[in-house]
Structure formats: structure tokens, C-alpha cells
Amino acid sequence: QIEDLKDKVNQFLAQAKAEGTLDEMYDRWVSRAEGTMPEISMPRTPDCKLRVGTTGMVQPFSYYEGTTLTGYDVELIYRFGAWLNAEVEIKIYDYDGIIAAAQAGDIDCIMANLNATEERRKHIAFSDCVYPSVTAVMVRASQDGNAQSGEKYETLSDFEGARFAALSGGVYDKLLQEVI
């Protein structure tokens, strides 16, 4: 177990943010969707081992390109490992198992596009924010096929009576149940 890991993650994030690394990564992986993993020099004689859980199923954050795990979160894992002077071991879990793995001590931390909800905060500690999350609602095009000529929605109450799809148990599922 790595002592003061949350503090170390937050120190790393603050430094990476100040240097512009997080913005560059977000621009490359998310905004431009280029999906290019840079070479990251890992330590030859690490001081510790960092076991990180991720999902491997959410592009552009953590996904497989053929048999190679890649993405924003994966790059972040390796950058943090290099900063920490650690050997990195990545373990893949689905969303149902990843928090349980952290609680059981199978992994030291999670880097997996995971929203910090009050329910999750009861079970695990969260670092400072890694990147901003922007949410939008997609609507079906109108009968004439033109999305611009359809109904206009300006507030959540405008969606009353509409049908939605959201990840069951996710942060937006809860929001929809509370608001609409």
C-alpha cells in the first residue's frame, strides 16, 4: 500500500494541470479524438508498485485498440506512475466490480472516468477533479429529418413526459429520476 496516495495523486494532478499537461491530454483524447498514446518513460528502478483499476470499455478514456489498452485514463495512469517512480500494474474491472476491488485492497486506486457521487463517496475517497464534465441531451430529429426544426428545449422541465435512456444507476439516471 502506498502511503498518503490520495495526497500524492492530488499533488500530481495540480502539477500536471499547472504545466498544461491535463489540458493537452484532454484536447488530444477528447476534443480532437486523435487517440495517440505518447511514449512515457517509466522508472528502471521503481520505489513501489502502483496497482490501478480501470474499465477498458469507455472510449476515449480507457479502451482497447486491438489488444492494447489505451486512452486518456491509461495515459494518466502511466504519467502518475512515472511521477511516483512506481512500477504500474493495470487491472481491468467492470463498473460493478471496480469499487469493490478498491475496498478489498486488490487495487491501490481507480482511474476510470468515474463520477464522484455521494453514494460512492461513502465507500471510497476521490481525488481532486481530473477534467471537466460537460453534459448534453441528444434528441431525435423531427419528422422531416432536420434536427434544427424540432422542438426547442431550454430547461429540464421542458422534457416532462419525454422518454430517456441513461446508464442504470449512473449519475444521470439519478438526475433524471429527481428532476423529470
Language model segments and positions:
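Acidic, polar ligand-binding/catalytic clefts
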Residues: 1, 43, 74, 78, ...
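Helix-loop-beta element that forms the nucleotide-linked donor phosphate-binding surface
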Residues: 180
